[in-house]
Curated annotation (Swiss-Prot):
CDD domains: ABC_NikE_OppD_transporters. Belongs to the ABC transporter superfamily. GO terms for cellular component: ATP-binding cassette (ABC) transporter complex, substrate-binding subunit-containing; membrane. The gene is sapF. This is Putrescine export system ATP-binding protein SapF. GO terms for biological process: peptide transport; putrescine transport. It comes from the Bacteria. Part of a putrescine export transport system, does not play a role in resistance to antimicrobial peptides. Does not stimulate K(+) uptake ability of TrkH on its own, but increases K(+) uptake by 20% in the presence of SapD; has no effect of TrkG. It is found in: Cell inner membrane. Pfam families: ABC_tran. PROSITE patterns: ABC_TRANSPORTER_1, ABC_TRANSPORTER_2. It comes from Escherichia coli (strain K12).
Length: 268
C-alpha cells in the first residue's frame, strides 16, 4: 500500500489590508482545506483567476505563511521559515522563467546556489550533481557557462525544472509552469516530467487554468472557486461526471461536454 507523502490539514490564508486610518479590509484568499498526496502521484489544482490556487501553492512551498492549518511530509510537520528542511523535500517551478531566473548569473551559479545553501557537498560533488541534473532535463554540460537570456524559451523552462530537481525533492509544485510555451514545447516538457516521475517517484502539484493539460498530467484534481475547494476526485471521475457548475463550465469550454469513461481513455 502506498502511504501518504504530503498531508494538508485545514490550511487557510487570510490577508488583511489597511484601507484607511481606522479601517482594514479582510480577504479570505484560501478557506480551510485538506488533502493528501501520495508518492508518484500528480494532483492538479484548477480554477479561474482569483480562486486562491496560486496562494495555496505558495503556502505549500513555504513562500507565504498560512493563517491556520498544518502541513506534514512523511509525517514530519512543516513550519513557516524552515527553508532548509522544506526546500530539500518540496521545490517549485514558476510560470515565467525569464523573471524567476537571475539574469546576472550563469546556469552553473543558478544551480549551485541551492546546493551550497542546503547541503554539505564539496565543490566537485556539487559540479557533478549539476551536470547530472542538467542531463536529466535535456540540457548539455556546455550550457553551464550560459546566461538565462542565451537560452530558448523551452530551455529556460528546462532550467527551471533543473533548479527544482537539484536537491532531489519528493514534491515539485508547478504554478502554471508551462502556460507560456507553445504546444510542441509544452508536450515535450510534460513527457519529460512524466518520465522523471516514473523513474524517481516524484510527486507533482500542478496549478493550472488549462483543463486539457490537467487531463493529461494528473491523477487527482481539486477545483477551487473563491478560495475554497468546490469539487475533488480522480481526474477521470471529475471529467466524466462533474458536479459543480464551475467544473461543468470549464469542461464544456474545453471539450464541449463531459467525457465518458471510454472517451476519456481513448482521448488520453
Amino acid at each position: 500500500m502506498i502511504e501518504t507523502l504530503l498531508e494538508v490539514r485545514n490550511l487557510s490564508k487570510t490577508f488583511r489590508y489597511r484601507t484607511g486610518w481606522f479601517r482594514r479590509q479582510t480577504v479570505e484568499a484560501v478557506k480551510p482545506l485538506s488533502f493528501t498526496l501520495r508518492e508518484g502521484q500528480t494532483l492538479a489544482i484548477i480554477g479561474e483567476n482569483g480562486s486562491g490556487k496560486s496562494t495555496l501553492a505558495k503556502m505549500l512551498a513555504g513562500m507565504i505563511e498560512p493563517t491556520s492549518g498544518e502541513l506534514l511530509i512523511d509525517d514530519h510537520p512543516l513550519h513557516f521559515g524552515d527553508y532548509s528542511f522544506r526546500s530539500q523535500r518540496i521545490r517549485m517551478i514558476f510560470q515565467d522563467p525569464s523573471t524567476s531566473l537571475n539574469p546576472r548569473q550563469r546556469i552553473s551559479q543558478i544551480l549551485d546556489f541551492p546546493l551550497r545553501l542546503n547541503t554539505d557537498l564539496e565543490p566537485e560533488q556539487r559540479r557533478k550533481q549539476i551536470i547530472e541534473t542538467m542531463r536529466m532535463v535535456g540540457l548539455l554540460p556546455d550550457h553551464v557557462s550560459y546566461y538565462p537570456h542565451m537560452l530558448a524559451p523551452g530551455q529556460k523552462q528546462r532550467l527551471g525544472l533543473a533548479r527544482a530537481l537539484i536537491l532531489r525533492p519528493k514534491v515539485i509544485i508547478a504554478d502554471e509552469a508551462l502556460a507560456s510555451l507553445d504546444m510542441s514545447m509544452r508536450s515535450q516538457l510534460i513527457n519529460l516530467m512524466l518520465e522523471l516521475q516514473e523513474k524517481q517517484g516524484i510527486s507533482y502539484i500542478y496549478v493550472t487554468q488549462h483543463i486539457g493539460m490537467m487531463k493529461h498530467i494528473s491523477d487527482q484534481v481539486l477545483v477551487m472557486h473563491q478560495g475554497e475547494v468546490v469539487e475533488r476526485g480522480s481526474t477521470a471521475d471529475v471529467l466524466a461526471s462533474p458536479l459543480h457548475e464551475l467544473t461543468k463550465r470549464l469542461i464544456a469550454g474545453h471539450f464541449g461536454e463531459a467525457l465518458t469513461a471510454d472517451a476519456w481513455r481513448k482521448d488520453r
